[in-house]
Amino acid sequence: MTTSVCLLGASGSVGESTLKVLRAHPEKFRLHSFSVHSNLEKAKEIQKEFSPDFICVSSDFADVGVLGNKLGRTQILYGESSLCELVREPEVEIVITAIVGSVGLRPTIAAITAGKRLGIANKETLVTSGPLIQSLIAKHNTKVVPVDSEHNALFQLLESLNPNSVEKIILTASGGAFRDLPVEQLSSVTKEQALHHPTWNMGPKITIDSNGMINKGLEVIEAHFLFNVPYDKIGVVIHPQSIAHGIVELKDGASFLYASYPDMIFPIAHSLFHPEPVPKVLRSYPAKDWGKLEFREPDFKRYPGLGLAFEAGKVGGTAPCIFNAANEAAVELFLKDEIRFIEIPDYIRETLDEIKIEFPLSLEEYEEADRIARETVRNLKARKVVSAC
C-alpha cells in the first residue's frame, strides 16, 4: 500500500530532491499532486513521469493555454487558493510544503486543519505566525516533521534524548559566500556574487538570505516554535564544511551532533519515512572522509540580519512577521538592482522601527502586518530616492 504525497513547490531545489526520494521508492510513495508557481515546462516533465491526480499552477499570470485544464489523467488547477484545495484532498496523507515565502502560510494551515502529516520546509510559516501555528498543531494533533536540514537534524537528536538533559540547541551555518570576505568589501558585492552559494544549490531568494545569514535568523525563529526552546537556549555556529547539521549540548557538558553528506535527500527521506527508518543508504559518508571540521562564532557585524532575527524573535508578536516580510521586500529590491546587498538588513531594521508591534489572535492580523511591512519597505525606498535628488 503506497502513501499519497502532495508536494507544494515541486520545481524548486527541495521539490526536486523530494522527487528523487519518491523516484527511489515507488513501492512506498505515490505523488498524488504537486504545485509549481509558473514553471509550466517543469510541470509537464513531472506530470509525464509521475502521472499525479492534480497539478496546481499558483501564479495568477500563468498561460492557461499551455497545460489547459487536463493533461492525460491529471486535472490542472490555477491560483493560490487552489493550493489549499490540493492539500485537503481526502487521498493525501503527507504534505511537503516546499514553497518559498509567506505564500505557503494558508496551504500549511489547510494541511494542519485537514489532519495531514506535514513535512515543513517553508520556514516562513512558523516565522510569520508561530503562536497561531503552534495552537493549530496542538488542536488538531498534527504530526510535523521539519524538512530543513538543520531542523531535521535537531528533531532526530531531540527525539532520542531526555528533554531534561538538554541545555542548548545549535544550528550550524556555512557562513555563505562572503564568510571570509573583508567586511569593508561587502558594500561592493554584486547580484551575481550574492546568487552563488558555496554548499547548497538553491533558488535566488534563499541563496541571498543564506549569504547574509538572514536565512539562519529565520531558522532560529522557526526552531524556537518547533522545539519550544527559548532564544537564549538557541545558538548558531559557522561550520564551513556543512557536514554537521545540528548540535545538542547537554547539561552535563557533553554534546551530540548529527552529521551527513550535505544533501537534502537525507532530511526529506527522514520526513517521508518517519517514524520508520529509511530502509537503504542514501549516500555513504564515513567519518574517515570528513577531514577537518571547523566551528566558529558568527560575526554580527558581518551578519547584522542574524542579530535582528534574534531581536525580533525575543520581542515576539508581529515582530518576526515584520522581519520576514521586510526581508522579502528588500531582497526583491536587491534582485531588481535597486538597493545594495548590505542595505537589506538596514531596510529590515528601519521597518521594525517604524511599525508598532501587535500580538494578534487571527491569521488575518498576521497577514495585515505582513502587508504593512512590505508597504513600509517600498515607502522607505521611495523616501530615500527623493532625499537623494
From Swiss-Prot:
* Enzyme Commission code(s) on record: 1.1.1.267
One GO biological process this protein is involved in is:
isopentenyl diphosphate biosynthetic process, methylerythritol 4-phosphate pathway involved in terpenoid biosynthetic process
Q: Binding of NADPH: at which residues?
A: 11-14, 39, 122, 124, 203
For the ligand (Mn(2+)), the binding residues are: 148, 150, 219
- Which pathway does it take part in? Isoprenoid biosynthesis; isopentenyl diphosphate biosynthesis via DXP pathway; isopentenyl diphosphate from 1-deoxy-D-xylulose 5-phosphate: step 1/6
Pfam families recorded for this chain? Answer: DXP_redisom_C, DXP_reductoisom, DXPR_C
Q: Give UniProt keywords alphabetically.
A: Isoprene biosynthesis, Manganese, Metal-binding, NADP, Oxidoreductase
GO terms for molecular function, please? 1-deoxy-D-xylulose-5-phosphate reductoisomerase activity; manganese ion binding; NADPH binding
Give the InterPro entries listed for this entry. Answer: DXP_reductoisomerase, DXP_reductoisomerase_C, DXP_reductoisomerase_N, DXPR_C, DXPR_C_sf, NAD(P)-bd_dom_sf
| Binding of 1-deoxy-D-xylulose 5-phosphate, residues | 123, 149-150, 174, 197, 210, 215-216, 219
**According to its UniProt record, which reaction does this protein catalyse?**
2-C-methyl-D-erythritol 4-phosphate + NADP(+) = 1-deoxy-D-xylulose 5-phosphate + NADPH + H(+)
Task: Name the cofactor(s) required for activity, per the record.
Answer: Mg(2+); Mn(2+)
What top-level class of enzyme does the UniProt entry assign? oxidoreductase
UniProt-listed Gene3D superfamilies: 1.10.1740.10, NAD(P)-binding Rossmann-like Domain (3.40.50.720)
Keyword Transmembrane helix carried by entry: no
Q: Which residues form a coiled coil?
A: none
Family per record:
Belongs to the DXR family.
Q: What does this protein do?
A: Catalyzes the NADPH-dependent rearrangement and reduction of 1-deoxy-D-xylulose-5-phosphate (DXP) to 2-C-methyl-D-erythritol 4-phosphate (MEP).
The name of this protein is 1-deoxy-D-xylulose 5-phosphate reductoisomerase
Species per Swiss-Prot/TrEMBL record: Leptospira interrogans serogroup Icterohaemorrhagiae serovar Lai (strain 56601)
